[in-house]
Amino acid sequence: MSEEPRNYDLESQDTTERRYAYNFDFDVMHPFMMRSFESFFQDGSLLELGSFRGDFTKRFAARFDDITCVEASAEAITEARDKLGSKANILHSTFEEAALERQYDNIVLTHVLEHLDDPVGLLKRVNHEWLAKHGRFFLVCPNANAPSRQIAVKMGMISHNAAVTPAEKEHGHRCTYSLDTLERDAVAGGLEVLHRSGIFFKALANFQWDRLLSTDIVSQEYLEGCYQLGQQYPDLCSSIMLVCERGKV
C-alpha cells in the first residue's frame, strides 16, 4: 500500500517528462477500443470506472442512455460534468470507498487497473458486487510488451518491458501489465475470461504518434492496418484487452 495519501488531482496532471493523456489516446485508441468492445456490449446500463475528464464517456453516451461513472479526481470530474451534462451520473469516490447500490450490464475499466494499489481487490468488487449476472466487463491496460516499450528497453531508456518508469510513477502507475499477468489478476478476482485480444500494433511512443498525427504522413488506411495487425499479434499491441463475465460469487 502507499505510504502517503494519494493526490489523484496531482497524479492526473501533465509533467515535463510525460503527458497524462495524448491525442493518440483520444483520436486513435478510443475509437479502436470502442470498435473492439462493440460486438461484446450488452444492452442496458454501463458503469465506467475511472472516467477522467469524460472524453471516452462521450463515446459511450452515443451508445448507452444509462451511464454511471466513478472518478477519484475532483478536478477531472468538474471538466467531465461540463462535457457530459445529464448524459452520465458521475460519482466522486475512490473505488475502494464507492457505494453502488445496483448492478450493471456493462462495466468498463480502461487504463486504470495499473494505477491501483490493490487491483485484485477492485476486480473482486466488480465480480461480486457490480457486474450483473449476464453482464460483461471490459478490462484494458497499456501493454508491457508493446514494441514501443521493447525498443525503449533496447535503447537503455527503461530496464525491462514491465518496468514502471519514473514518469509513469508520477502519474500513479503501480505496475505494467502483459496479457499473462492481466489474466492472472482477472482470474484472482473471480472473473471468467471470455475473450482476450490486443488493440493497435504500436512501434512508436505516444509523443511520437502525436507529432505524426499533426502531419499528413499517416493515413486512415495506415491506422486501420495497425489495428488489423494488432488482431493478429495481440502481444505487440499498444493496449491489451480482456472481456470477462461474472464468475462464481
Question: Where are the regions that the model predicts?
Answer:
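A generic alpha-to-beta junction signature in SAM-dependent methyltransferases
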Residues: 84, 130-133
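Conserved N-terminal segment of class I S-adenosyl-L-methionine
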Residues: 1-110, 123, 198, 223-225, ...
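A short helix->loop->beta-strand "cap" motif at the edges of active sites that frequently abuts
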Residues: 65, 132-135
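S-adenosyl-L-methionine-dependent methyltransferase catalytic module, highlighting the catalytic core
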Residues: 3-8, 16-28, 55, 117-129, ...
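Short catalytic micro-motifs in class I SAM-dependent methyltransferases
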Residues: 111-115
